[in-house]
Amino acid sequence: MVVRKGKKSRKLQGRTRTMGWGRVGQHRKSGSRGGFGAVGFHKHKYIWIIKHAPNWYGKHGFRPRSRIHENVTINVGELDELAWRLASNGKAIIEDGLIVLNTVEMGFDKVLGSGKVTRGLKVIAREITEEAKRKIEEAGGKVILLEELEAGSAT
């Protein structure tokens, strides 16, 4: 094959009407690419969607703030410190030798198991991890879940 000395675009410049694209109108507007923009994504360009943008359709994005609820948590170590502070101020509620901490009234949803428990606590909680429950009971404390309280008061 003969090597082309100049570019095709330079050769065609200024002297041809169709610039090597056949009949007038071929390659002129958006018909050659199947329409402008996102046209045909559910029709003739669907294979492109499957290959390059599989998440194009469907719901994505933000959830309403009113629907999102993040658990507010507290560790047993922090509860122990809080109990010590309340006891030293004389504001602690004591039942059967245990300092009562109602985490639901404090605004916490869940009690986690990080930290040490050094005194007997009676913890009322909405949710609690196994580790936290074990640590509180090993220190001579007691755990009461809110469900148990509500079930007990209903009967």
Curated annotation (Swiss-Prot):
A Pfam family of this chain: Ribosomal_L27A
GO cellular component, one term: cytosolic large ribosomal subunit
GO MF term list: rRNA binding; structural constituent of ribosome
Keywords: Ribonucleoprotein, Ribosomal protein, RNA-binding, rRNA-binding
SUPFAM superfamilies: Ribosomal proteins L15p and L18e
Biological process according to GO: translation
The family this protein is said to belong to: Belongs to the universal ribosomal protein uL15 family.
Subunit record text: Part of the 50S ribosomal subunit.
Function field: Binds to the 23S rRNA.
PANTHER family: 60S RIBOSOMAL PROTEIN L27A, LARGE RIBOSOMAL SUBUNIT PROTEIN UL15
Protein name as it appears in the record: Large ribosomal subunit protein uL15
Originating species: Desulfurococcus amylolyticus (strain DSM 18924 / JCM 16383 / VKM B-2413 / 1221n) (Desulfurococcus kamchatkensis)
Gene (name only): rpl15
